[in-house]
Amino acid sequence: MKLTLVQIFFMMLLLLLGLGVGLGLGLQMAAAVLEESDQLLDEFLSSDSQDKAEATKEGLDSQSTETLLVSNKVVPPEDTIVNEDDVGGDRMLRAEVLSQSNKHYLRSDVMDRECNALMAPNLKSKDHPCIPQYVFIHEEPDTVKAVCKSPAVACDLKEGKCHKSPRPFDLTFCKLSKSGQVIPHCNYVTFILEKYILMSCSDMKVQITSKS
């Protein structure tokens, strides 16, 4: 069977049309895939940016909580303590040993170490001056009592007789944010420390020291 030129022409035309339609469909499918990929990428980037923003906000919230605990200043401190080594200075401070029966004994929960909460039971006399500085010792009572069995060392008491802890003790140091405050309007700055202490066993006063 012989094909005429007209038949060959029509066959080639149909073939070209078929290729054109197939190519068009292929391009449409490729464009759809690319568009879907772009949408997925945009969603991923948007989600990633949102996660980073949330993480940043959480970090700022955590930092604010920590700063509030450590500083806790409603009234700006009159004498700012800039270094842990300056806490307490060379003065003998009133101290209290917190036993396990005390709700503030827990060392792991720093929110239980906030000075305004710790100091509240000691501030009963209304219109009396606030206690300027105070130390809470978060150790077993027997551990603290054992310090009194150690050799006596010199300290800033009149008698000059104190006893030194064998290791740094877990302490909460409370400092009045501004002098002149009276009960019940006492506001304290909180410092959580691990320091050696010099202790007078007669009247339970301590001196905080960094020296081993």
UniProtKB/Swiss-Prot annotation:
One GO BP annotation of this record: positive regulation of flagellated sperm motility
Chief place where the protein resides: secreted
GO cellular component, one term: extracellular region
Tissue expression from the record: Male-specific expression in proximal caput of the epididymis.
UniProt-listed Pfam families: RnaseA
Record carries keyword Cytoplasm: no
SMART domains in the cross-refs: RNAse_Pc (SM00092)
UniProt PTM comment: The N-terminus is blocked. Glycosylated.
InterPro entries (alphabetical): RNaseA (IPR001427), RNaseA-like_dom_sf (IPR036816), RNaseA_domain (IPR023412)
Transmembrane segments: none
Localization annotation: Secreted
GO molecular function, one term: nucleic acid binding
Keyword Ribosomal protein: no
Function: Secreted proximal epididymal protein required for post-testicular sperm maturation and male fertility. May be involved in sperm adhesion to the egg zona pellucida. Does not have ribonuclease activity.
The name this protein goes by in its record: Inactive ribonuclease-like protein 10
Source organism of this protein record: Ovis aries
